[in-house]
Amino acid sequence: MPVRQGKYTLLLPSMPGISGYAAVVGKKESEGPLGNVFDYIYEDGMAGEKSWEKAESVFHRDAVTRAIAKAGISPEDADVIFAGDLLNQCTGTTFGIRELGIPFAGVYGACSTMALSMAMASIWVDSKVCNTAVASTSSHFCSAEKQFRMPLEYGGQRTPTAQWTVTGAGATVITQNDCGARIEKVIIGRIQDYSIKDPNNMGAAMAPVDVKLTPYPILHGRRLLYKNLKTGGLNNIG
């Protein structure tokens, strides 16, 4: 069972592990520094579909299916999936995973959805509420532009501060099996509002919560330091 350490940290004694994971992306993402580690690269951003939203559903379903297969299980073995995306009602997710038949708990954490879904999945597994939980998320540059900025058809000029939303999806399978990567603690962040007024510069709005992780997690009366702080979507300006 999870044990609260201090005010913000949840210690997971059983240390749930990541038994399977997958990430699929679009062409632009494949040209970045992580291009050679993705499971699949879609050269066609439409993925053969008629809309950006439907394409995102294809990405999401593909990532979840690949992660489950790499974990050596079937969709029927998954007790729950925590998943979400950037769209209204998480439509990219719901239409993507509906055919898998996994009990679905929708998560809307914007750019924190992957971390939030993994946190929830880990807590459920550690609590023995379930044996196998899936955590996943997706986004698409074109559907996100329509949702948060301007539709591409509008032809608006991008500002120098505008981040580029990932076209892709990621998924993990969280279990109690002996895994190389384990989740020992969960820390839920607090809202940090620095009154950023530029709607294009989402990175600057999100960055403060990453650098203000205080108080540090406390374990056995000793303050712990973070070995690494990994984040995405903030860009150089953020």
Residue ranges and their predicted role:
Residues P75-E76, S127-S136, A181-I183:
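Short secondary-structure capping/junction motifs at helix and strand boundaries
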Residues Y108-A135, I174:
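Active-site-proximal alpha-helical scaffold in enzymes
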Residues S57-I68, M114-M118, M206-Y216:
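Short, hydrophobic/amphipathic alpha-helical packing segments
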Residues M1-E53, P151-L225, G238:
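Condensing-enzyme catalytic core mediating Claisen C-C bond formation in acyl metabolism
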Residues I18, W52-C111, R223-G238:
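Conserved beta-ketoacyl condensing-enzyme motif
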Residues P33-V37, T93-P103, V125-S127, F148-Q157:
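A glycine- and small-aliphatic-rich helix-loop capping segment at beta-alpha/alpha-beta transitions
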Residues S19, A83-G84, A133-S139:
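Short beta-strand segments
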Residues Q89-T91, F141-K146, Q192-I196, G233-N236:
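Short, well-ordered, mixed-charge alpha-helical segments that flank or form enzyme active sites
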